[in-house]
Swiss-Prot record:
The chain crosses the membrane at residues 7-27. Pfam families: PSI_PsaJ. HAMAP family: PSI_PsaJ (MF_00522). It comes from the Eukaryota. Belongs to the PsaJ family. SUPFAM superfamilies: Subunit IX of photosystem I reaction centre, PsaJ. This is Photosystem I reaction center subunit IX. It comes from Cuscuta obtusiflora (Peruvian dodder).
Length: 44
């Protein structure tokens, strides 16, 4: 039962960290390329 509680407590921590990292990544991209629907280095 203790291992099951440990397993259930790992998923929220990992999802919070991964979503926080992804949100920070998007914020930094929008800081360098504001309002970019297509990135400048992908346009030909």
């Amino acid at each position: 039962m203790r291992d099951f509680k440990t397993y259930l407590s790992v998923a929220p921590v990992l999802s919070t960290l991964s979503l926080g990292f992804f949100a920070g990544f998007l914020i930094e991209i929008n800081r360098f390329f504001p309002d970019a629907l297509t990135f400048p280095f992908f346009s030909f």
